[in-house]
Structure formats: structure tokens, C-alpha cells
Amino acid sequence: MDILNELEWRGAINQVTDEEGLRKLTSEDKIALYCGTDPTGDSLHIGHLIPFMILKRFQLAGHHPVIIIGGGTGAIGDPSGRKSERQLQTMDQVHHNEEALTAQMKKLFGTENFTIVNNYEWLSKISLLDFLRDYGKLFNINTMLNKEVVASRLDAGISFTEFTYQILQSVDFLHLYRHNDVQLQIGGSDQWGNITAGIDLIHKVEGPDTKVYGLTIPLMLKADGTKFGKTAGGAIWLDPEKTSPYEFYQFWINQDDRDVIKYLKYFTFLSKEEIDDLAEKVEKEPWKREAQRRLAQEVTKFVHGQEAVEEAERISKALFSGDVADLSVAEIEQGFKNMPSVDVENKKENIIIWLTDNGIEPSRRQARQDVSSGAIRINGEKVDDVDAEIDPQAHFAGKFVIVRKGKKHYYLARVK
């Protein structure tokens, strides 16, 4: 399938500057294309996957993706999608974030047929006088003010620093065209003004017939109208230390039936036939949640690898069944990260006293009732003897005791 046809089918195209010209170019030749990300944090999140999935599809089709780490622009701050001025980072913060993001991108794209560059390398060499003379003269203030990214900030105010961001991004496109043969820039729908500004700059400097293009991606909204990627608990990070692979897997498996097929098209490499088959299953047997499971498997595999998928599914199965005894210490750390936890002494104790003194049961009467009725499981085993003894050293290398009350309520006791 033609790459643009595939992107259209997957719902990944919002606007293209010259679709006919881009279609002709990509059908006749392999091109270099790019998108940029500023190092505002030390990890990518799932929002970054939106443009990166486009780059990855081009890469798999034989084209050459380039990613700019905005070491220069990141020190300035992109006003796109912002209602207020960004807080400037220190250069030490910027450099730390650059290193972390670079490592994550290499994991997603590999090292073959892929380039990472840092715009600090060329932007830092432009003096103020050169900037004003060589580039400032080529930008019309009226045109810049009419760009949505600037116009939306005029009432609240925008600093000259952020106002010049689109010039810097345009310089990036020109630099990559000259030095990396880049002919296409990819960005979110809020980047349209910055992308077209870059194309205009290239046409002014290199000639009006220069073949450069821009493509933006639709704003990703959930069926309820809220923005994709935002959760009550905050961002879903690609760094496994910030969002564990289990949490990452759970995010995807919990998607709404109304959204899951759209996400399968966008965030996986499954074929049209495979996705159509899953769409039919959502229609006929939604309670099986096969589409959600496949979505979670595919995206987790892409970001964290197959081993992380298997680990996440082991944790999920154990928590559902209550059979937690075979989980590793690392799996317990992941699976119980957001569950109630208590710190307990490393000593043997009667179960009734232990449950009550550690706040898992509100009273000894309630503890006796729950234990004698079989509602309490310790490390996966039912305990119905009120005279039983808890030994914190018995399982999980003496680090944890897992308590389950009823069918759904878990507590993680961390042994001091």
C-alpha cells in the first residue's frame, strides 16, 4: 500500500501542504523526513508516540526518519498549545533531558536508517546580528501574528523569546534540507503554522520550486471528547521507572470499545485485515476485550519488548486469580505499585493481631469474622484459622506479605 494511502486509512493525516506533490515524490523515491521534540523532560510520554508512529511507518517503508532533539529550541520554549509562558530550564537540565530522550528514541527506531540530531549544534552558532540579518529580514511580522500559534496567545501576552520560536523551527527545516536532504516535516495539528513558515523560508532561500512539504496529524481525542494520553494519575511515560511496563500495558487494555479500533490503526503495525477482524469481535463479543488485549500487547511490545508483555500478563493473571505466590519481587513491585501498602515488622505474629495492628482490618472482631469466613488470603493461600501465624519471611525473599480481602481488595505489606 502507498505510504500516504496507508496513513489516510489509519486516520493519521490532518493537513498536507501539497498532497499531490508529496504523493508523487514518495512513490518515486525514498526521502528523508523529520519531526522535532524539545527536551522539556527526561522521558518521552505516549503523546510523543503520535508523531513517532508516522516516522516509524515511513522508516518501515524504506524512507529515512530524522529526529531533532531541540537542545536549542528547548532552551527557548515552544508556545504551541500553551496559554502561558513556559518556565525556562537551566542548560544542565536541558542537556540531561537530551541524553535521556536520545536513548529512548534509539530503542524505538534502532540505529539503522535513522538519524538523531540536536539543533543546539547549529542554532548556538548563529549570532544575534546574523539571526536578524539572514533570517529576520525574511519573516513578515503580520504573517507571523496571523499564525494560530501566536494569535492564540496575543490576549494573554507572548514574549519576544517565544515569538521567535517559529523562526528557529524554520531554520531547523532549512538546515536539515541542506545537510540531511530532508524534504518533509511531520508535526501535530498545532504545528501547521511553524511548518509552513519553514517551507516559506526554504522557498525564499533555495528557490520557489524547491520540493519540501509538511504533514500534520489530527488531534487525538477520546470518544468522550477529552484529549488522548491524559489520565487521572498523570502522564503515561515511556521510561519504565516512571510508568512500569505493567501500568503501561494496563493503560492500553483499559481503553474504551469506542476508541480501541482507532488506536489499533494508529499505534500498531497490524494489517487492515487483522484490525477489521478485531473490529468485528468488538461488535459481536465486546465483553471478551480481545481488541484491547491485542492493542496492549502490540504497543507494550513496541516500547518495552516482548518480555515486558509477558511479565505484564503474568501480573494481570495473578491479580485476577489471586494466585500471586509465583510472582517475582520485581513483578510485585510493578503490580502493587498503586495499591494500598503498609510497613510491617519482621516478626511472626498471630494473624488476627497482625491484620488489626497493621491497619488492614479495622478491629479484631472484623478480622476474626473475615478470617473464619475464608475471605482472607495470605500470599495467595486461603487462611481460615484464627490461630494461624503470619511469618513475613515465608515468601518473596522476606520483603513482602500480600493480603487479599474478598475478591478485589489487595494490600501490600512491606517488611521493614
Swiss-Prot record:
Enumerate the UniProt keywords alphabetically: Aminoacyl-tRNA synthetase, ATP-binding, Cytoplasm, Ligase, Nucleotide-binding, Protein biosynthesis, RNA-binding
Query: Out of the domains of life, which is the source?
Result: Bacteria
Which Gene3D superfamilies would you find in this protein's record?
HUPs, RNA-binding S4 domain, Tyrosyl-Transfer RNA Synthetase
GO biological process, alphabetically ordered: tyrosyl-tRNA aminoacylation
Domain S4 RNA-binding: from-to ranges: 349-416
Question: A single GO molecular function, which one?
Answer: tyrosine-tRNA ligase activity
Record keywords: RNA-binding included?
yes
Cross-referenced SUPFAM superfamilies: Alpha-L RNA-binding motif, Nucleotidylyl transferase
**Enzyme Commission number:** 6.1.1.1
Return the GO cellular component terms, semicolon-separated.
cytosol
- Is the RNA-binding keyword given for this protein? yes
Primary localization class, coarse = cytoplasm
Q: Family per UniProt?
A: Belongs to the class-I aminoacyl-tRNA synthetase family. TyrS type 1 subfamily.
Known role: Catalyzes the attachment of tyrosine to tRNA(Tyr) in a two-step reaction: tyrosine is first activated by ATP to form Tyr-AMP and then transferred to the acceptor end of tRNA(Tyr).
Q: How does it assemble?
A: Homodimer.
Q: What is this protein called?
A: Tyrosine--tRNA ligase
Organism of provenance: Limosilactobacillus reuteri (strain DSM 20016) (Lactobacillus reuteri)
| Taxonomic lineage from the root | Bacteria, Bacillati, Bacillota, Bacilli, Lactobacillales
Gene name, please?
tyrS
